[in-house]
């Protein structure tokens, strides 16, 4: 029965940050890059846009996937966009675009939306949702903007910023799940799995360590009789 099969998660994304987020939570995903051209999809609503792109990424990987008979295969597609001043910001077109965005964003706030589409390939079911987090940007200087953009980091991420990289000091605070800003919300992933009647603990990699309980040692005591 599929319910007793070990779980396999395929991440339909080239994002190192999403992969690291999963790995830090004890989940080792397989990675298949979707190849979806994000510029071909348009919408007036940021939440609808990121969810549609997440669906397309998951679907693109599904067409190339070969599910294993001895595993229950899941595919997660994600996409993120920044909603700012009524506009939708994905990745900036170039350095000049990134600089212009930061000149507008500094000292102000926006909402980062991350769409998640989780497909249970084995059972033929799907669960999806959008996570949103408010981001408050620091009042950065022109020099800070120019130096940050010159690193290239803002050019490859939605909204032209990160919170887990060089852009971290330029974000004063957030309201919501930080994983949403990175591009994958673990609490939302748990809820989507629950909709499919699956526990997130079933995705933990074999050998995932646990911290020793108080009063115990992680190192086995020697056997006097050995």
UniProtKB/Swiss-Prot annotation:
Keyword GTP-binding appears in the UniProt entry: no
Pfam families named in the record: Maf (PF02545)
GO cellular component terms listed in the entry, alphabetical order: cytoplasm
Signal peptide: none
Top-level taxonomic group: Bacteria
Keyword set, alphabetical order: Cytoplasm, Hydrolase, Nucleotide metabolism
Disordered: annotated segments: 204-226
Compartments in which it is found: Cytoplasm
Biased composition (Polar residues): 206-220
Top-level EC class: hydrolase
UniProt keyword annotation of Cytoplasm present: yes
Family: Belongs to the Maf family.
Cited PANTHER family: BIFUNCTIONAL DTTP/UTP PYROPHOSPHATASE/METHYLTRANSFERASE PROTEIN-RELATED (PTHR43213), BIFUNCTIONAL DTTP_UTP PYROPHOSPHATASE_METHYLTRANSFERASE PROTEIN-RELATED (PTHR43213:SF5)
Role noted for this protein: Nucleoside triphosphate pyrophosphatase. May have a dual role in cell division arrest and in preventing the incorporation of modified nucleotides into cellular nucleic acids.
Protein name: Nucleoside triphosphate pyrophosphatase
Originating organism: Salinispora tropica (strain ATCC BAA-916 / DSM 44818 / JCM 13857 / NBRC 105044 / CNB-440)
């Amino acid at each position: 029965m599929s319910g007793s099969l070990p779980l396999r998660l395929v991440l339909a994304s080239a994002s190192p940050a999403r992969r690291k987020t999963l790995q830090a939570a004890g989940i080792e995903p397989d990675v298949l890059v979707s190849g979806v051209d994000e510029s071909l999809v348009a919408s007036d609503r940021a939440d609808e846009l990121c969810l549609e792109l997440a669906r397309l990424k998951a679907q693109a990987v599904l067409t190339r996937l070969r599910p294993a008979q001895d595993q229950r295969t899941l595919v997660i597609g994600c996409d993120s966009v920044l909603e700012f001043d009524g506009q939708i910001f994905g990745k900036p077109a170039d350095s000049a675009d990134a600089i212009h965005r930061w000149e507008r964003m500094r000292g102000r706030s926006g909402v980062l939306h991350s769409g998640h589409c989780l497909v249970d390939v084995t059972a033929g079911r799907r669960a999806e949702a959008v996570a949103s987090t408010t981001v408050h940007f620091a009042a950065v200087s022109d020099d800070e903007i120019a130096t940050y953009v010159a690193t290239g980091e803002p050019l490859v991420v939605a909204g032209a910023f990160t919170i887990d990289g060089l852009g971290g000091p330029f974000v004063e605070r957030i309201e919501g799940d930080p994983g949403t800003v990175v591009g994958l919300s673990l609490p939302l992933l748990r809820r989507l799995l629950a909709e499919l009647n699956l526990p997130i603990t079933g995705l933990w990699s074999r050998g995932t360590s646990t911290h020793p309980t108080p009063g115990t040692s992680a190192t086995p005591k020697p056997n006097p009789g050995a």
